[in-house]
């Protein structure tokens, strides 16, 4: 079983907006080298934060409307949601410390 959740148009509202946990959403594409570099770290964070934070992935090629909805122009883009609201975002490859810090801030705010 994969540690991350695949998100699409059909399950975005349920898995992200109505989640009772903070959600980190990774907008990525199969052809994106930096996205592939970030993926193993996100999988690790998903396992380590299981039960506290949900880590989800949106393939922008398969879900262009979701990418457009959030103005995704560069990937990878990480969106941080809590209580159904977008609370923060990062664009490009970021380090583990940055991701965990942003997750901690939104978890405390909920």
What label would you give each PLM region?
Residues 3, 8, 28, 54-56:
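Conserved Rossmann-like nucleotide-binding pocket used by diverse enzymes
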Residues 4-23:
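A short beta-strand-turn-helix
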Residues 20-22, 39-58:
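Conserved helix-turn-beta segment immediately C-terminal to the redox Cys motif
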Residues 20-21, 28-31, 74:
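Short pre-active-site segment immediately N-terminal to redox-active cysteine/selenocysteine motifs
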Residues 27-41:
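Conserved redox-active cysteine motifs that mediate thiol-disulfide chemistry
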Residues 58-67:
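Structural microenvironment flanking redox-active thiols in thiol-disulfide oxidoreductases
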Residues 79-110:
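Non-catalytic, surface beta->alpha helical segment in thiol-disulfide oxidoreductase systems
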């Amino acid at each position: 079983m994969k540690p991350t959740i695949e998100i699409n148009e059909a399950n975005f509202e349920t898995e992200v907006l109505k989640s009772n946990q903070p959600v980190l959403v990774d907008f990525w594409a199969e052809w994106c080298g930096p996205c592939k570099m970030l993926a193993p770290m996100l999988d690790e964070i998903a396992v380590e934060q299981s039960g506290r934070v949900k880590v989800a992935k949106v393939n922008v090629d398969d879900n262009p409307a979701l990418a457009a909805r959030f103005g995704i122009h560069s990937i990878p883009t990480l969106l941080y949601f809590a209580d159904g609201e977008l609370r923060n975002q990062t664009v490009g490859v970021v380090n583990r410390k940055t991701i965990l810090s942003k997750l901690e801030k939104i978890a405390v705010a909920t």
